[in-house]
Amino acid sequence: MEWKIVVPLLAVAFTVANAGLVGGPMDANMNDQGTRDALQFAVVEHNKKTNDMFVRQVAKVVNAQKQVVSGMKYIFTVQMGRTPCRKGGVEKICSVHKDPQMAVPYKCTFEVWSRPWMSDIQMVKNQCES
């Protein structure tokens, strides 16, 4: 008799555990315009905060997620690196140095909260480590 109760409960628990949390973070597609715009915003804000004369760019996207929260929260884990372009210079496409000693790579976690209907986008987390 107990197995008639235990088996369905285990099946429900297994299904819920594998389905993911409703409203929780999910993988973001880097081909999506909203995701790309949020990452670009994060990079611009990050560069404003760095005490370096050179622009930093994303060398590699390690992880990208999004979460519906009264708007959209984007969570990025990225590998950043220095470019040869100086801050405040003429805007052009700048790639990260190929030489790791020049690129000085480091890992960052950025969180961006976007509410497009309010024309509002904010950086809520900008955390980096060497």
From Swiss-Prot:
Keywords: Disulfide bond, Protease inhibitor, Secreted, Signal, Thiol protease inhibitor. Its main location: secreted. Disulfide bonds join C85-C94, C108-C128. The record marks G23 as: Reactive site. SMART domains: CY (SM00043). A motif (Secondary area of contact) lies at residues 67-71. This is Cystatin. It comes from Oncorhynchus keta.
